[in-house]
Each structure stands twice: as structure tokens, then as C-alpha cells.
């Protein structure tokens, strides 16, 4: 299949990280961008799409998600992290069955496609159901089976989650022509015992996998880890070998200068989750410090239970303005840096060097926004327009690997009514 997008604005990123806008044409052949220019190409395309007043940009990458948790949207609102998790979330999660994960994953995918997300990183339970949902929908995802252990007497052999994680990797890693990748995942320091973490981290390294963890989300987490082990969660994971694999660390709100040095030394990717951190009262991640240290900083929504949506445009908005407010400096973070977090930095975190920007030879993971809106005119700074003015409802097209998955309110690969029917049935059973 080949498509030529005509008369559109194209958001381009130079090698120097500077964004520019070009009015012209973008050609897609198969799963790849094969033309960008101001003149109409001479090659033949099977489909031509007039995109006047539309902006084409890279698809957004949500690097920290628990997609089936859309079924828990709003549960435990108003509680801090520990009480929210242990008193409200865990009891519901104990009742989850695979059918719930299937329903929740597809509902989350509807939300993500309509809001311009083309790829996401997910850690949760019954992950084969999420794999199936992503395969059907046509999205990209890095999916992991979250490993936990609350019993210090449990042996590595007794932990059933570890072999489930390994089986998932062996069965699905690089499935669907690489759209689906399998990561390894440890929930957090406070939900997993050291001997399990060490053994599982060694497995991840042996398989050449990527690791996805929660890390230093709150000061309480850090204080309790120091009381238990005499070191911060960052130092604890380093000692146990977790950071020896390419690691994506969500939150990193309460990190010291020493922690940041460890993260940098191991090339850890940090995922900024501003909405979730605000909603749970967790605090503010030291975004500028992390970036100045040379750490790759990506963006995520967290699960819908602590956000309460999967809207990456809202996430970009907060990531742009929040640090400027609490640091009393409007230059603390630039809109271009935030766009990087949501696109090319996310691609780097997921190990997808072939996406994240619009360029010839890159994968055609593209979204289109309708600029013919009062809140999007005039436009003197496209990155700022996207991070501080655009809404997810401005998205009119979402394409992954050259295939249109969502256009003008219509889903091309999922049956919206069926997804809602199954989601309602899951909610009814869970909360009966």
C-alpha cells in the first residue's frame, strides 16, 4: 500500500534537535516514509489524501502505562500512592481474570489511537491478552509481565511470575514484524524481595532484554528503602544488577544527585509522569537536573487509575509548564524538549531507532492534527502550539507502520461497539 499526503504542514526535526515546519508532501510506501518535499513527487501512489490545514507529526509514544487499568479509572481518588495502591487497587487486581485484561487493553487502545498515541510501554498482568489486543489493533507496544514478591521465604523457583515473563519473551518478542516487543519488569523495590530481583535481573541480562520498573516515586519510598537496606532504591537496584540491562525507570521523583549519577552511569532511561505524580501527591521530578546529566527523558501517562486518562497531549502540556512554575523560571524546560520526550526520546527508550521523527527511511508512525481550529491560530511556534494549545481531540488520523488505524472518529481495526460491550461486562463483574 502507498499513500501520498498532499498540501500539509510537516513537523520536521533536524539533527541538531531544532524543529521546523515544511508545507508540502509526504509519501508512504509500505511501512516506511519514502518522500518528503515541497514539490509533488513523480512516483505513483495508490492513494492520495488532501491534507489542507492539517499538520503531520510523529506519533506520540506513551512510555509508562498499565493499559488494562482503564477498568479502574478513578478508583481511590484523593489517596496518596501507598494507600491508593494497597487499600484500593491491589484488592481489585486480585479479582482480575484474562478476559478483563483483554477488555481493558482494547478500551485503552481506542483511547490512545484517538488521541495520537502510536506506541506504548506496558507493565501488567496476563500480558498475553494485551499482546493479542495490540496485534489486532495494529499499534506498537513494549509489553511486560510485572514481577512482584511480598514473601521473603518464597524461593525463586516458587515465584510463578518469573517463568511467565520468560515465556512471554520467548513467544512474542519481536512479533508482528517487530511491532510488539517484550520487556522484563519489576514492579518496585517495595513490592519485591532482593533475591527475586537479583535472579530476575540476571535472566533479563541473559536474554538481552529491556527492564521496566517503578523507581523512587515518592520520598516515603526512598526513606523506607534506606531504613530497610541502608541505601536508596536507585542504589539498591544497581547493587542487584537490575540496571545492567537497558532500563526504563518510571517517575524518579525523589532522586538525589548521587542517584542521578548512578542512572547516568548505567544509561537508564527515565519516564516523566507529571499528571500521575501530581494526582497522587508524589511531587515533582527534577526534570532539568536529569536532562542536564545527559539522561534520556521520555513521557508517560501512567495507568488511567492514577491520571485518569491516557492523553499524551495533556501530559505534554503539564511537562511543559509545570517545571517552569515550581522552579520560577519560564526557561526551565522548552516546548521542543517536551516534544522530544513524547516522540524521539520515547522511541529511543523502547529501542526503536526507526521511528520518532518524520524522515525518509523512518517507519510511517504518523498522526495528523486539524489546525483549522480557533485555539490553534495563529501559529508562531509549532512546538509550543502542540504542547500548550493543542488538544487530543484535534487528532484526525493515526497511522502505524503505514497503516491507518484511526481516521475522523472511525477505527479501522477494532470494533468500537464490541470493545465497549466487553469493557462494560468486565466492569460489571469486577465491581459486583
Model-derived segments and their meaning:
Residues 129-253, 258:
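Metal-coordinating catalytic core of metallo-dependent amide/deamination hydrolases
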Residues 8, 26, 31, 53, ...:
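Divalent metal-coordination and catalytic microenvironments
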Residues 1-24, 29, 39, 342-432:
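Active-site microenvironment of metallo-dependent hydrolases
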Residues 257-258, 264-295, 300-301:
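A conserved active-site cap/scaffold subdomain adjacent to cofactor or substrate pockets
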